Regions:
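Short strand->helix junction
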Residues: 30, 47, 89-90, 183
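Conserved alpha-helical substructure of the radical SAM core
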Residues: 43-83, 98
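Canonical Radical SAM [4Fe-4S] cluster-binding loop centered on the CxxxCxxC motif
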Residues: 17-60
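Conserved AdoMet/S-adenosylmethionine-binding subsite of the radical SAM
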Residues: 91-185
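Short glycine-centered, acidic/aromatic-flanked micro-motifs in structured strand/loop junctions
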Residues: 27, 84-86, 180-182
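Auxiliary Fe-S-binding modules of radical SAM enzymes
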Residues: 1-21, 59-63, 70
């Protein structure tokens, strides 16, 4: 992969209210997501899917992060977290667990911010358990509001996601956060 392409796989470090200084990991191409949220800052979802796919190689993602980490060290910038906050849903990446394991070699905590859509899957929970900090999105407690706000992939079921979040809480040893977009119906 060319340097210009590698540079698109990570960004920062940037200030984060929750994570201090974080270096963003962009493991998903733009707008590949399992949701099409009405409030998405990235615009319309281009590829709505729930199939986990290989988007980039683990080596390319790690090399991109390494380049940014080295550049930050040269500037005496601290990095508190390597944060998976891509332009789509990070758990759609079938290599997420391997990427987290490979990035741990830098000695920096790993965070993943997810819309929780695939948390019902055991393989996704297993991958997320390798991170140090995970945030899962909860925008609605009813199927009607959930579809209205998050416009989820039609094959997803809110009950499965809610159960998966409960299962994940009992399996995960790190810091577990949730985030919610409040809206007026």
């Amino acid at each position: 992969m060319k340097i210009e392409e590698l540079e698109k796989l990570s960004f920062g470090p940037v200030p984060s209210r929750r994570l201090g200084k974080s270096l963003g990991i962009n493991n998903i191409p733009a707008k590949v997501c399992s949701y099409a949220c009405v409030y998405c800052q990235l615009g319309k979802t281009l590829h709505n899917q729930i199939k986990r796919t290989s988007f980039y190689t683990v080596d390319d993602l790690v090399l991109s992060a390494k380049m940014r980490i080295e550049a930050a060290k040269e500037k005496n910038e601290m990095i508190d977290y390597l944060a998976f906050v891509p332009d789509g849903e990070p758990t759609l990446d079938m290599h997420l667990g391997d990427e987290i394991e490979a990035l741990h070699k830098f000695g920096i905590k790993i965070a993943v911010i997810s819309n929780a859509s695939l948390i019902w899957r055991e393989d996704v929970r297993k991958d997320l358990c390798k991170a140090d900090w995970v945030s899962l999105k909860v925008d609605a407690a009813t199927e009607h509001v959930w579809h209205k706000v998050d416009r989820a992939n039609k094959s997803l079921k809110l009950d499965d996601i809610q159960k998966g979040m409960i299962d994940f809480k009992s399996e995960f040893q790190g810091f577990y956060a949730t985030e919610t977009c409040l809206s007026k119906e």
